[in-house]
Amino acid sequence: MTVPTDVPQTSATEPGAARRPHVVVIGGGISGLAAAWRLARLRHDLDITVLEGSPDVGGKLRVSEIEGVAVDEGAESVLATRPEAVRLIEEIGLGDDLVHPTAAAPRLFLDPELVPLPSGLVMGVPTDLASLARSGVVSPQGLARIPLDHVIPQTAIKDDVSIGEYVGRRLGPEVVVRLVAPLLMGVYADRPIHISMRAAAPGLFAAAKGERSLLQAAQSTRARSNDLVTAGPVFAGVRGGIGRIPQVLRERLQGAGAVVETGATVRTLRRAPRGWRLEVGAANATREVLADAVILAVQAPVATKLVKGLSVQAETELSEIETTSVAVVTMLYRRDDLPGGDVPEGSGYLTPSDALRPVKAATFASHKWQWIDDAASARGFVAVRASMGHADDVAVLQRDDDELARLAADDVAFVARLGRARPAAVRVTRWGGGLPRYPVGHVDRAQRITEALESLPGLAVCGAAFDGVGIAACINRAEVAAARVSQRLGQDGEWRHG
């Protein structure tokens, strides 16, 4: 592992004395850690403190072992077609462990079979109708409906539209149910009818505003994407798990002199005569922390409480950002128990929304990641991850862990035709309120919140509630927040306006 040597050293001091400006980052998830890291690289003269309320950093990025096999409990990959996440991985010294998925492709469950997805999808919108027809994913009636997109009048799009509503209107409901829903529910844990097209598919949204046909808009979006992206895999991972990223980030930050505290709940955030005053700690044992600038990098419900009294507009709009809960059930099967000694071919499967299955998607982790297969096979196992729960199915997560694990195992056995094979080891990870929902109007709401909070001197905001739930999107937003602080905070701790 190559250890970076160009990160400035910092040393914590109280604001006021022999002045090194003090910046506090509230939140030690990937957004908060990435903001602190970028700030440390931009400015050599700052004291940086990260305050995380939970026992560990990382937020939804976590990896742990199950029967000696390391498997991510949250996100397992980053988008490699944009630079932020890959660059960060390389900067913190994990570049040698950067890996890409195998060539195995996901399947779609069409009872009773797992079938390949058609090629050329743009957020579930088809661009290759011949491939779609060959796949059998859409019925003959559904296929006949799609070309009407070229002749029906253009659908007016104003500031935003539901992606489910828009695609359904242009291409028919089958495309939404069989293609758009499986792909988007895996990312947003929500039905397409509830998801903002502008937020979830900004490129397609922009193209659709200028095209009469959605099919044409999807084709132009795909062409632009191919022009902008160099040849290479779309996704990337880290050998040993994406969950290593926040742990190594913490080590690098601490090595650079930053303070990273866990179990440090920020209870209040208030303006001080100069900068900010934070109340930190347990309810009966709080302490005061002073900061010249603050980067708020927490989930919307937490941010709502912290901005109370600072901005009525931001507080109100943050309180309206809903969240949804999900669970990831990791299962290790003994190879000897599986029909043919393995799970079906492919990297896993997605389920259409009309299938009404409790598992919305399953990843055959041993097929998708060579490093997982190496570790699992050495112990005689095959690793599978099952994703459960979405905004319209909260009941499935009300089961206890044992019940949820049994339900996941039974459903995967049915869909993947595993017969009587059941996992030898199971791990249930719950992410309560883990994903912000992105309804129609989300982009404008996020902008209003940002403007309201960043009108306050010495405050910047980032996190998954704003510009995207993906790791790369979170890092990008965090780096923007860090740049704002770097540019505005003077060496004397004063905040420059403009």
State each model region's role.
Residues 20-50:
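N-terminal Rossmann-like FAD-binding beta1-loop-alpha1 element of flavoenzymes
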Residues 2-18, 118-119, 126, 344-345, ...:
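Conserved flavin/dinucleotide-binding core of flavoenzymes
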Residues 40-66:
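Glycine-rich FAD pyrophosphate-binding loop
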Residues 67-154:
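Dinucleotide-binding Rossmann-like beta1-alpha1 core, especially the glycine-rich loop
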Residues 37, 41, 63, 251, ...:
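Short, well-ordered alpha-helices that flank and scaffold nucleotide-derived cofactor binding pockets
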Residues 2, 8, 14, 262-384, ...:
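Mid-domain catalytic core of redox enzymes
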Residues 31, 56, 301:
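Conserved Rossmann-like nucleotide-cofactor binding loop
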Residues 125, 144-268, 290:
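Active-site/ligand-binding neighborhood in enzyme catalytic cores
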